[in-house]
Amino acid sequence: MKKKIIISLISIIILTIPLFILVQNNLENSDEIIAKESLITYQSNLEEKFKIDGYTIDNPNIILDPYDASPLTALVLFETNDEVEPTITIVGKDELTTYTYESKKSNKHYLPIYGLYADYENTIIIEYGDVRKEITIKTNPLPDNFILPTSIKADKEKLSNDLYFFTPSSRGYTCAYDTNGDVRWYLTNYAIWNINKLKNGHMLVSTERLINAPYYMTGLYEIDMFGKIYNEYSLEGGYHHDYYEMPNGNLLVASDNFNSDEGTVEDYIVEIDRQNGNIVKKFDLKSILNMEDGKSENWSSYDWFHNNAVWYDDKTNSITLSGRHQDAVINISYETGNLNWIIGDSTNWSSEYQKYFFKPVGDNFE
């Protein structure tokens, strides 16, 4: 029995719909908006190639990298007389790297093909009813500057046929590897920090544009596995490190307030309304914590907290954040922004914050 593909999204710092752009109302740089609308228009124009009339399973329309953004993907288009539900198999080098999934029932078929090998004659099997069609898709090599794993270790008895997604924290490619360490998906557009699957099946990645050095990006793209952009969320304070999709669909985003009097970074959280792109809530950590407390080795007055994680807990209606430069994990109320608790070493913290620290219990703590 063929396994269904399970796509596991892993983010390392160490999937026709109208196209539109959601931008923050007070974004000042209109040139950036125009530039990105042009890219979305470019992708929309590419859909003119997605012709299906007259194509059959014996002579399908095969489009490699349909949105010019994800070279190891393809689109296979054809018509059938009756409504059928095709099964697609991307043949791998073994069972764990072979992916099988079903398409929707229709007589007009736009079959997404994900997980091709680079520089390879990929075999794709399409089946429905008594029909079995085998097609070959030849891909191009990886870019010369694509950094590959130097050592691969896998306990395959404990693995399933997943794709494992990676993002860089600086330069590199957002990509996915199979259990053999072969690249099976990547984006040509520069995207860093987090990558997660949204509830609607799309993914969220950074834009490719810097708003401030060294790694503060202008915002986030909502994309699918083709790299097709559905929405852009632009932020006046940019985006870095992490975001979280809330139960209502809004996004909590690690951001910055570049206009603050203190001139600090990585101490600001915003909530984006997914329907219109507006900022509906802000959390300024400077009003919650003492900037001079809990200094780690890399602490500076400019980057005093260095928030690198955002998490929302629905049960307690609270937000958990990770401050590398204060060596602390903190939790605040979503409603009020008040501090709830701190995990870390309380030694170098002011007396007013001592009551918020959890007390270690047991022999495992020093």
Specify the residue positions occupied by each region the protein language model found.
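Beta-rich interaction/scaffold domains
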Residues: L22-S30, G129
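Short, compositionally biased P/S/T/A/G/V-rich stretches that sit at domain boundaries
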Residues: L27-Y67
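Short beta-strand segments within Ig-like beta-sandwich modules, predominantly Fibronectin type-III
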Residues: T100-S106
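N-terminal Sec-pathway targeting helices
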Residues: M1-I14
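Extracellular low-complexity, O-glycosylation-prone stalks/linkers
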Residues: T89-T97
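Hydrophobic alpha-helical membrane-insertion segments, chiefly the h-region
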Residues: I14-Q24
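Histidine-/acidic-rich catalytic cores in large beta-rich domains
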Residues: E37, T56-I90, H109-Y110, Y114-E121, ...
